[in-house]
């Protein structure tokens, strides 16, 4: 919500609020209101219910039109009811209460009000479902495949030894790589915490905690952006940008904070290509310094890359003093399929 409001993103957040988790009622787990959360970020809150379909459709239309016209986010809360158990047979609610929800259900109401229309919709739905199931039955199964993940552990990589006689810092080499890629490809964008240099809010030079991005925010305006300290959120946004055809490079200030990014990588970025039958590409690069012996304390000095090894469709690369960082980044930018 914060990022959407801050960057004026025309997005509609649809919250289907059925008032319960698996068995825990919202009154036991939520303090305050959904509307209050939206207002805290300056986002308009709209509310409707599946109990009144006409009103729901009208509210949805208002939300869509306002988001497009004003180019701002909207939080649309749809109050609804869960008619069945959360997953299988684990519903411990009062049967009489559940029955009252069934009576309110719009589909059940339609069956009573207009049985002809109801039956027409059911018939069309059954035909569609039957058609899809038939396609699945006729398609090739995955059983004949040993794995649906490409074998890349033995991939040959063209590499060259880093010439230690070259008088250039590793960070400077990374900077040159980023600058060259941004020059040659307008789809390359940089996101991260404190990566901008001189801007309207702070005139002094900065360019990242380790000075990797330097003056890139001045050389490529609107393509280098400071973000809030919201690692999970900015990783999700970067993943979405990659799916949309951009080439985002996300900087996480310290490798220790990659624990906050893990869920977005494991459950989303690395899975999308397989989930969508190779029709989706996620050319996302996440860069982060890791390691100890710098006196930064127990939460800024860890090397946790091992926790990411073994995730399908994710390249994990560790820079070292024997390889030219520029070459590594050039190779990473050529990967247009999956995250690095």
Locations of the language-model features?
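Thiamine diphosphate
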Residues: 3-6, 147-338
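Short, structured coil/loop segments at alpha-helix boundaries
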Residues: 103-107, 113-118, 138-139, 171, ...
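Conserved NTP-handling cores and scaffolds of large molecular machines
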Residues: 114, 140, 269-273
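Terminal amphipathic helices with adjacent charged low-complexity linkers/tails
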Residues: 127-161
